[in-house]
Amino acid sequence: MATTPFGPRYTAGMDTERLWAPWRLGYVQGRDAGDPAEPVPVDAWRPAADCDCFLCRAAAATPKHDRILGVVGRTERSVVVINRFPYSNGHLLVAPLDHRGTLAGLADDELLDLQRCLVRWCDVIARAMESEGFNLGLNLGRVAGAGVPGHLHWHIVPRWAGDVNFMPTTAGVRVLPQSLDDLWLQLTEATR
């Protein structure tokens, strides 16, 4: 086993303690589309929606599906969803309602609405979760890191002093201190 001045070094495949994350199995196996308890009616889907896209599903769903889909906010042109595989606690996705993968396809009013959503939700998170900063990002295309290249979405990643600890470095894992459902409750309460 390799060691460092700070102890054993994490090596892929070595016998280590395990952190169980059973909610990731469907994603890893490619079968997790975030289906709500009740299907979204076909007539609710927007034109050109991708029925396999969780952001299109969130855009088409009614408020009764918001909790199970992680939707914390909507406007006439956008939807705000909790990232189910977050980089940090409070990681949100801000997406246009329509399924499109390029900025060129967005109208000026959509761009303005998306930017206003980023401002609003940074403020909500800062107040509700006392975050000290944010990383905001947009990955355009699969080679740029987009996990859903067909549906634009901005990441809001809250940050705190000392929020990255030894776990990612030594064990290759991140520890998130709050369940996604508790986060949904906290953020929706903060916007009431």
Protein language model annotation of sequence segments:
Residues 1-89:
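Active-site microenvironments that recognize anionic phosphate/pyrophosphate groups
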Residues 129-144:
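A short glycine-rich, hydrophobically flanked beta-strand micro-motif that places a catalytic Asp/Glu
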Residues 58, 83-85, 97-99, 139-141:
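Histidine- and/or cysteine-centered catalytic micro-motif in compact active-site loops
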Residues 91, 96, 141-168:
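Histidine-centered divalent-metal-coordination microenvironment in nucleic-acid enzymes
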Residues 92-116, 171-176:
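Short histidine-centered catalytic/ligand-binding loop motif
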Residues 5-7, 11-12, 19-33, 159-192:
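C-terminal helix-cap and adjacent tail motif
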Residues 53, 80, 96, 114, ...:
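Divalent metal-coordination and catalytic microenvironments
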Residues 107-131, 181-188:
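Long, well-ordered alpha-helical scaffolding segments within enzyme catalytic domains
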